């Protein structure tokens, strides 16, 4: 599979100009016409520089594997770091009478459980979101290449927002299957006092009570929450980066240093995160209540909460998701920089399309 994807990636519109030089300029140089001295012509220095600049080809198995590793770090570490805020948010959703607001929620939790109580659920959070990040970012890169090659260069540019939405939705579908068991255990630990304090205690107890259903009954609401969230996260980020370089950053991306590019990544990530929190919050409320209660269904929970109830805890979630999304993109892009992975610039209109639209002579 990866070999076919790598082959498609070579001509992909999201590929970098440097990598195109690698593919076009570093073929079998013995087949090149001989030079004036009769020796085979050597590849251009520019292509050689591109080989030294990147650690792997765009679209190779190594590229996708390292993108997945970047997803593990970006999602696993950030979600674990905000466990206290997530815990209070979940408790506000399932028991709004007791936890009346974000500050009151922290106060009540500290009073009843102490400082250690704020870390409840850290293990399933780390494991679950690490697996989710692996699938989310790794498969996004795969689907982006596959879908863009199905569309062709010109349509990829014209319909790039739709492509981002489709690729991210496809990736998140699989990512949520990996996340669901750990998310169910996390919510039980955080919202049911006395049920279990650790993943080791919660998982066997859940299986004994409800079987495998206990771990996957929340997967459909997870799709409801995470797929819109991820579609917004990737599409909004990609287009915000494009807009920042076009209208805000005073110089082209190619002239920006790596730290400057990472600042743009962080800002675009935070903007995307605010929108992510808003579109996914109602489903997040349903997931929190559903995983707390035995024998309940998403439709019953949604009916009971009502329109006002599903928006409880939104402010806390905007703070959490905005910061979270910005840090995730920053970490993910930093991993690409560290491992010297290809980082294509924002897409530009193909020359063939410019000619069709009469934008060039």
Swiss-Prot record:
Keyword tags: Acetylation, Membrane, Methylation, Mitochondrion, Mitochondrion inner membrane, Phosphoprotein, Repeat, Symport, Transit peptide, Transmembrane, Transmembrane helix, Transport
Example GO BP: mitochondrial phosphate ion transmembrane transport
Residues with N6-acetyllysine modification: 98, 208
Segments annotated as Solcar repeats: 62-146, 159-243, 260-338
Family, as annotated: Belongs to the mitochondrial carrier (TC 2.A.29) family.
SUPFAM superfamilies (UniProt xref): Mitochondrial carrier
Superkingdom in the source lineage: Eukaryota
Matches recorded under Pfam families: Mito_carr
Catalyses which reaction(s): phosphate(in) + H(+)(in) = phosphate(out) + H(+)(out)
PROSITE patterns: SOLCAR
Keyword Mitochondrion carried by entry: yes
Principal subcellular localization: mitochondrion
Membrane topology: Multi-pass membrane protein
Positions bearing N6-methyllysine: 111
Functional note: Inorganic ion transporter that transports phosphate or copper ions across the mitochondrial inner membrane into the matrix compartment. Mediates proton-coupled symport of phosphate ions necessary for mitochondrial oxidative phosphorylation of ADP to ATP. Transports copper ions probably in the form of anionic copper(I) complexes to maintain mitochondrial matrix copper pool and to supply copper for cytochrome C oxidase complex assembly. May also play a role in regulation of the mitochondrial permeability transition pore (mPTP).
The name this protein goes by in its record: Solute carrier family 25 member 3
Transit peptide: first to last position: 1-49
Spans within the Mitochondrial matrix topological domain: 86-120, 183-217, 284-313
Recorded GO MF terms: phosphate transmembrane transporter activity; phosphate:proton symporter activity
GO CC terms of this entry: mitochondrial inner membrane
